[in-house]
């Protein structure tokens, strides 16, 4: 419900802006580095395996100039993020290497302040909120632990984060489970955009989720984005 409210607020804000506001529409693309912040409890833990994983994003930007310096910044982007985690179920590492790959549609709403450094360069720091909707990016790989008495083996498997995963982990009646990831996410975003010669842009943003995208292990999105673009 909170995520849907953010979407409604973004759309409403875009509709009620003064007609005199100058609108700049652009396109941008780039790469991101992502991982998950962890706050699991009750035996459900998670750890990042390796460093932050690279992904990509493509999108459309819409900047509304309000007055001399203030700007309302929004748009819509398609972002794919990746991570590899060690996932624990009741303190047992049933999933020592779990690939997580997701596609997301990101809708931000930021307030920016345009600092005109020169006739050819502007810097725009910004802060705001975002809402996103996740959809599948195909099968992901994971390693699963099988235990029969003192014999422990690791076997490869496939899973889809939006569907979750479960399997029989050994005797007697043990099972390993990964809860499905949620589609809707929302959180905060801060950024800096450089506008060169009024048309070319270089942007850096950091997004952090407020909502747990996977409640079982307490995972929240954390993504650094770098983009270059063109404003019409």
Task: Give the role of each language-model region.
Residues 36-53, 81-104, 134-183, 212, ...:
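Extracellular/periplasm-exposed beta-strand and loop segments of Gram-negative cell-envelope proteins
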Residues 64-68, 115-119, 196-198, 232:
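Outer-membrane beta-barrel strand-turn architecture
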Residues 27-29, 74-76, 109, 125-127, ...:
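Membrane-embedded beta-strand positions of outer-membrane beta-barrel proteins
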Residues 21-23, 68-69, 116-122, 138:
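Short loop/turn motifs that connect adjacent beta-strands in outer-membrane beta-barrel proteins
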Residues 52-56, 101-107, 121, 184-188, ...:
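Residues that define the transmembrane beta-barrel architecture of outer-membrane proteins
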Residues 24, 220-232:
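Outer-membrane beta-barrel "beta-signal"
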